[in-house]
């Protein structure tokens, strides 16, 4: 199996292809990307027959920016007979996957695929039963075994394959299903909520998103991102010349500072989180984030970089490289992750976590 399917945001296939070609090449896994505009997916075809599995096991999925999900596949199954689509799919997967822990029947995230998704939901139950009978799936779901993927690109036309549960997105189609809270000031709140799900392991939430932490929201108006921090019982300094939603001010947890986010300097030294979603050139935002991290003004940050119309992968890569260079130059040990989230549009979201030596049981205490 020498092909890897990467799901992405429609319109960002070229960026996804450029990224996987670059990062696979650095690991000496060579191939070429098949790109169809606005398809919502890319196929990276490796030159060597076993390199598909090698790629999805060796390259950390968390290092990819534009891919929502990935899995290795074989040849395209076409003209599946409407009276029995199951038998050919089972036949393709037998001998390829043994005792998979989960089945996902998926489509690309496009308007054209919405009707197809209804079929996928109905088709999943009988297909799962058949794959269990054939030994392709275990009789129960388990995160310890590979995930079996059946990816429909058209009616009667699909790829079959698998991903590794420890190196993929845990979400169906790579999209966390989040509900917009009716009391949130803006829909942008879902960006930060999704970022927390993607970047922070669930078992670390109580420690890293703890009650009573201090946080700063730069460019906060009207308070979509502040809302997420308040919901987690943090004390928030919301920095913006524009007004904050009254519902947030009424909580008593928010201090509104009428200042420019680029000029604000914190007067506390125990700020755990700084978040930032400002409409500004990515280089300017990255320089500000580097300043906060180098000076130790916060422990973790999540921020958005607005993308230009062209060379978007190059722009993001350049800014992340600059940030890493600044941290290295000042001896700051940190983890950097970036992802174009489902709720992002022409932007990517970056998470940086400063790391200190462990003291007294805390993972990152100063």
Curated annotation (Swiss-Prot):
Annotated keywords: Cytoplasm, Methyltransferase, rRNA processing, S-adenosyl-L-methionine, Transferase
GO BP annotation list: methylation; rRNA processing
Enzyme class: transferase
Gene Ontology MF terms in the entry: S-adenosylmethionine-dependent methyltransferase activity
Major localization class: cytoplasm
EC numbers, comma separated: 2.1.1.186
One GO cellular component, as annotated: cytoplasm
Domain of life per record: Bacteria
Active site: 306 (proton acceptor)
Signal peptide: none
Residues binding S-adenosyl-L-methionine, per UniProt: 188, 221-224, 240, 260, 277
Pfam families per record: FtsJ, RlmM_FDX, RLMM_N
Reactions this protein catalyses: cytidine(2498) in 23S rRNA + S-adenosyl-L-methionine = 2'-O-methylcytidine(2498) in 23S rRNA + S-adenosyl-L-homocysteine + H(+)
PANTHER family in alphabetical order: RIBOSOMAL RNA LARGE SUBUNIT METHYLTRANSFERASE M, RIBOSOMAL RNA METHYLTRANSFERASE FTSJ DOMAIN-CONTAINING PROTEIN
Purpose: Catalyzes the 2'-O-methylation at nucleotide C2498 in 23S rRNA.
Family assignment from sequence similarity: Belongs to the class I-like SAM-binding methyltransferase superfamily. RNA methyltransferase RlmE family. RlmM subfamily.
Subunit structure: Monomer.
Name under which the protein is recorded: Ribosomal RNA large subunit methyltransferase M
Organism encoding this protein: Salmonella paratyphi B (strain ATCC BAA-1250 / SPB7)
